[in-house]
Regions:
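Short catalytic micro-motifs in class I SAM-dependent methyltransferases
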Residues: 107-111
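Core SAM-dependent methyltransferase catalytic element
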Residues: 202-216
Length: 216
């Protein structure tokens, strides 16, 4: 599992003022008139929370953010001191007893390095989600036309699984980071196995990330 403590401050600074089109797309699909209960799983830095604050009355949102990196949470707390933060591995998300009406995996789910953990994490997220509500997910499309040339050398040889998904080891700030590049069929399999209805599962318009929207 990726340890962001080694470069939390650098990562946060690199994401400062970065606006994700995918997040804006997700936020457009959320009803501002509802009492929002948000679970942010390993978003990193505070980009999702920041974009929420630009589009919603953040003081009225019950926002719960968990991250494996304690240093990343320290940075986030300085910017949003009144929100709920928990240092927790996403594999243990079932330790949270709250229920949520929107759960986000923004560039986080692709760090899980085996299908058993992917299945189990999604199952646990399903149990935390209120009926008829949604999970929003982005995963890095490392094999897309726009990404492939830059990251092809980081592809781990012979890592292709039965879905034709592949694994990458990418170095940032002298630290290795593992990424799973999903084939959309694997995401579809994981969703249906865990009883989700698939709203969207596709390469986003910018061609950099896959987006997946699932409904309980």
């Amino acid at each position: 599992m990726v340890d962001y403590n080694n470069f939390a401050n650098k990562f946060a600074k690199s994401r400062k003022n970065m606006k994700w089109e995918e997040i804006d797309y997700f936020l457009e699909k959320i009803d501002k008139n509802n009492d929002l209960k948000i679970l942010d799983i390993w978003c990193g830095s505070w980009r999702l929370l920041e974009q929420f604050s630009q589009n919603f009355n953040i003081d009225k949102i019950d926002y719960f953010w968990l991250d494996l990196s304690s240093e990343m949470l320290v940075v986030a707390k300085k910017n949003f001191p009144n929100k709920n933060f928990l240092n927790l591995n996403m594999l243990n998300v079932d330790k949270i007893k709250n229920k949520f009406n929107n759960i986000f995996f923004i560039a986080s789910y692709h760090h899980l390095d085996n299908i058993e953990d992917r299945e189990e994490t999604l199952k646990k997220a399903y149990n935390l989600l209120e009926k008829w509500w949604r999970i929003f997910m982005t995963n890095w499309a490392l094999n897309s036309e726009i990404n492939n040339e830059k990251y092809n050398k980081a592809l781990i040889k012979n890592s292709e699984n039965k879905f034709k998904s592949t694994d990458y080891n990418i170095v940032f700030w002298e630290n290795d980071r593992y990424y799973h590049c999903f084939d959309l069929s694997e995401l579809e399999y994981l969703a249906t196995k865990n009883n989700f209805r698939i709203i969207e599962n596709r390469l986003f318009d910018s061609k950099r990330n896959f987006i997946t929207i699932l409904e309980k």
